[in-house]
Amino acid sequence: MAISIAVETPLQDDVRALVARLNDHLLPLSPLEFQWKMTVEQMADSSTTLFVARDDTGAAVGMGALKVHSPELGEVKRMYTDVSVRGQRVGSALLSAIVDLARARGLSSLMLETGTGDGMAEAHRLYTRSGFTPRGPFLDYPDSQWSAFFELPLGVPTSRDNLSEISVD
């Protein structure tokens, strides 16, 4: 199955459905006060770029966003792949697209907050395989047992001709 990844607006019904599935997945993993959800409306803000993965039928099967906080700092947000494509490296391709865009924009660091526990083990493996290392809290995230924080120093920016469409076979 071929997967394509492109920058899209989050204000689409199938993307809203992905966000709902992500929220349902996260709900039992930590108390609500430690779930830092972005709504699709917040994801549509000009500081955020959303990548959507679609299968060969056009169905939205994954997403991940880059939120730019400053000229130096970006944050990975709302990473999710549908269970139907897990294990097919869709999450890795989404994360690579986010990292590439952060580098192209000249950011020096990419950080993320994710949950802890068994339900997040796959996510932690993805981030560490992609070069992210554990770190302490950043921005206004509190230090808690429910959060794990990761960082990827980006170094020298690279340029890519087309960051709006990426294919994964």
What is each PLM-predicted segment?
Residues 102-115:
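Conserved GNAT acetyl-CoA-binding A-motif
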Residues 112-123, 141-145:
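Conserved beta-strand-loop-alpha-helix junction that forms the acyl-donor binding cleft
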Residues 81, 87-101, 125-129:
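Conserved acetyl-CoA-binding loop-helix of GNAT-fold acetyltransferases
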Residues 48, 145-150:
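Short hydrophobic/aromatic beta-strand or adjacent loop that forms the aromatic wall/cage
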Residues 3-77, 82, 95-96, 101, ...:
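Acetyl-CoA-dependent GNAT
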